[in-house]
Amino acid sequence: MPQILPTDNPILDAAKRELAERAQKTAPLRTANDAYNGPARIISINTSAHKGTRKSPVADGHDTVIEQFGLASDAHAGHWHRQVSFLAAESIQTAQARGLDVNEGDFGENFTTQGINLLSFPLGTQLKIGNDVLVEISQIGKVCHTRCAIYYLAGDCIFPHEGIFGVVLQGGEVHAGDDIKVVKLGDGTCSFTPAEALQEVEQARREGTL
């Protein structure tokens, strides 16, 4: 919180402190680039039976990823451009440092990653997970039109500006602890993503709401 210089008016000082504390609590949670250290890997695989809710880590630490569909046991899987989702553990740690009681899956991500800033890669970048699974980045960030259960349960949601989505080019088994490798750097486009979806996200970024 920024330093609040005292004045001769204690009521004004208290009001300034309250406003500063409120601004700190409501400012967008963002993770510094230097927070990503160590090998790039999946540390948790998370699924849910319904959309708009927290996801839970799979009990045995592995699941099946289906080509052009997503995680077999997840509600967000389907024939669309947001088949799987990623969020960095470093982002969750940033939220924890702000006082939020959150852990892997609480922001609705399928894959909690560590050691790699996926936000730094353009659309179309292809990621190899473990031995088999190949995912192409299809959307970076999202626009939330309404606050879902995740926001109210966690107290905030960082996924709109720190999460990414992908489409499954090749399925297979995925395990917590699997390495993540960048096998192809994208050119900023993804043929699977509707133009209006990207336009909505870009407009939100320009307006400063994302």
Which residues does each PLM region occupy?
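Electropositive, beta-rich accessory/interaction domains or terminal extensions
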Residues: 2-134, 139-141, 173, 188-210
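Conserved "cap/hinge" positions at secondary-structure junctions
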Residues: 131, 178, 183-184
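A short alpha->loop->secondary-structure connector
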Residues: 145
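Short, charged, solvent-exposed linker or helix-capping segments at domain edges/interfaces
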Residues: 148-149, 178, 192-194
